C-alpha cells in the first residue's frame, strides 16, 4: 500500500522531497524527529542522515484550517531552518509555501504542495486512510536557489490563483510554479508545485523502483 502510485498522490495533502527520499503527507499533522524505544515519529530524520542534532520530536507540520495554509511548528532545541532562516522553539508557527527549503539537523528537503491544494486554497481531498507513505526514491522535480538536483522543466501555473487570505503576511503567498518534463507516470508528479520558481535552478531525479 505504501507505493507512489497515482491514487496515493491524489490523496496526499503535501509532499516532502529530499535528495534521497520522498514522503507523502496523508494527514493534517505530522511529526518529524527520530524514533526511540518509547515512541515513533512520522518522519524519522535520524535514519535519513539527519545527524545527531535531531530531537525525538523536532518539528510538526500541520494544516491551519482557519488561515487555510500549512505551518511548521519548531519543537526541537536546535531549531529548524526555513529558506535559510533559523527558527527556534517558542516562536510562532512558520507559514510554509510550496518549494520552501527546510533543514533539520543535517537533512535538507523541500516542502511541496499539489496544484489542487493551491487552486482550492486548502487540502485537495480528504485522506483515503489515516496513513503516511514514506518512499525512498529519486523523483523529478524541485528547484530552488542552488538546488540539490538539476533537470528540465516548464512553466505551468500562475501565482495569482493562490489565495491564502492573509494580506498582513510577508507577501510570499503566491509563487510561479514549474513542472518537470519526463519521469514515468506523468511529469511534475500529478501536479505538485515541484520544479521551482522563475529564475531558480531546477531539480530532476529518476523515479525509483
From Swiss-Prot:
What tissues harbor this protein? Expressed in roots, stems, leaves, young flower buds and open flowers.
Organism of origin: Nicotiana tabacum
In Gene Ontology terms, what is one molecular function of this protein?
Answer: sequence-specific DNA binding
Q: What is this protein called?
A: Transcriptional activator FHA1
| Broad class of the protein's primary localization | nucleus
A Pfam family annotated for this chain is: FHA
Composition bias type Polar residues, residue spans: 200-209
Q: Which Gene3D superfamilies match?
A: 2.60.200.20
